[in-house]
Amino acid sequence: MGILSVDLLITLQILPVFFSNCLFLALYDSVILLKHVVLLLSRSKSTRGEWRRMLTSEGLRCVWKSFLLDAYKQVKLGEDAPNSSVVHVSSTEGGDNSGNGTQEKIAEGATCHLLDFASPERPLVVNFGSATUPPFTSQLPAFRKLVEEFSSVADFLLVYIDEAHPSDGWAIPGDSSLSFEVKKHQNQEDRCAAAQQLLERFSLPPQCRVVADRMDNNANIAYGVAFERVCIVQRQKIAYLGGKGPFSYNLQEVRHWLEKNFSKRUKKTRLAG
């Protein structure tokens, strides 16, 4: 009965924000439909292609699942960071990995754990997302700047998770330079290949390691990611926990945290360089 009460309470907490997300998707579809009609009336070539709605049954299931993942996540601010199993994707040949500890021993394609990339002396910024999530890919240039500016005092890890909007699932219109056409991952090779595709489009500094979540989505579940999320691990604890994406995904908060804790050390490093 206690478990049922908890589940009911969580459901009641989720419902208001779930319906607000449904309203947002309905408004988004209305705007896109209006734009499509205007272009059609003007006989523009831009109307070619399929118009995809966001408010679909599959879309609603994905949104609901994302709130459940957030509600039942293992990660808590100030508590131990979940040591999820991941697969190493990126190589750091030619990169400067000084101070990264055991990270240098992890071979590309090897199965490892998230905290293998953490160092006792330095915070680890962990960025979760996928190529088919526009809010995530649109912030990759800002994430790259964070790596470039703070790699002297912090380590960075990008965790590639399940696709947010696979082309054979809850797809979104591919009308921007940030859009990707990636199908649902059928195996670990598919997920790692998608991560490599992302790296080919958005080059990240060698100081940032890239891994892929396992096919059981253990990192996604433990950190309640769903679409995207960012956190900071320090001494095996969660020092900063970002909000649930896409609306609460905020790299600016990460910048503020790093500046607050390490701005003086960064300045000394730049002067020494």
From Swiss-Prot:
EC number: 1.21.99.4
PROSITE patterns named among the record's database cross-references: T4_DEIODINASE
GO terms, biological process: hormone biosynthetic process; positive regulation of cold-induced thermogenesis; response to lipopolysaccharide; selenocysteine incorporation; thyroid hormone catabolic process; thyroid hormone generation; thyroid hormone metabolic process
Disulfide links within the chain: none
Gene3D superfamilies linked to this entry: Glutaredoxin
Record-stated family: Belongs to the iodothyronine deiodinase family.
Transmembrane segment boundaries: 10-34
PTM annotation, UniProt: Ubiquitinated by MARCHF6, leading to its degradation by the proteasome. Deubiquitinated by USP20 and USP33.
Enzyme class: oxidoreductase
Cytoplasmic topological domain residue ranges: 35-273
Keywords (A to Z) from UniProt: Endoplasmic reticulum, Membrane, Oxidoreductase, Selenocysteine, Thyroid hormones biosynthesis, Transmembrane, Transmembrane helix, Ubl conjugation
Xref: PANTHER family: IODOTHYRONINE DEIODINASE, TYPE II IODOTHYRONINE DEIODINASE
Active site: residue positions: U133
Name of the protein described by the UniProt record: Type II iodothyronine deiodinase
Function statement: Plays a crucial role in the metabolism of thyroid hormones (TH) and has specific roles in TH activation and inactivation by deiodination. Catalyzes the deiodination of L-thyroxine (T4) to 3,5,3'-triiodothyronine (T3), 3,3',5'-triiodothyronine (rT3) to 3,3'-diiodothyronine (3,3'-T2) and 3',5'-diiodothyronine (3',5'-T2) to 3'-monoiodothyronine (3'-T1) via outer-ring deiodination (ORD). Catalyzes the phenolic ring deiodinations of 3,3',5'-triiodothyronamine and 3',5'- diiodothyronamine.
Membrane side Lumenal: residue ranges: 1-9
Location(s) in or outside the cell: Endoplasmic reticulum membrane
Topological category with respect to the lipid bilayer: Single-pass type III membrane protein
Molecular function per GO: selenium binding; thyroxine 5'-deiodinase activity; thyroxine 5-deiodinase activity; ubiquitin protein ligase binding
Subunit structure: Predominantly monomer. Can form homodimers but homodimerization is not essential for enzyme activity. Interacts with USP20 and USP33. Interacts with MARCHF6.
Tissue: Isoform 1 is expressed in the lung, trachea, kidney, heart, skeletal muscle, placenta, fetal brain and several regions of the adult brain. Isoform 2 is expressed in the brain, heart, kidney and trachea.
Organism this protein belongs to: Homo sapiens
Catalytic activity, as annotated: 3,3',5-triiodo-L-thyronine + iodide + A + H(+) = L-thyroxine + AH2; 3,3'-diiodo-L-thyronine + iodide + A + H(+) = 3,3',5'-triiodo-L-thyronine + AH2; 3'-iodo-L-thyronine + iodide + A + H(+) = 3',5'-diiodo-L-thyronine + AH2; 3,3'-diiodothyronamine + iodide + A + H(+) = 3,3',5'-triiodothyronamine + AH2
Gene Ontology cellular-component terms listed: endoplasmic reticulum membrane; membrane; plasma membrane
Gene: DIO2
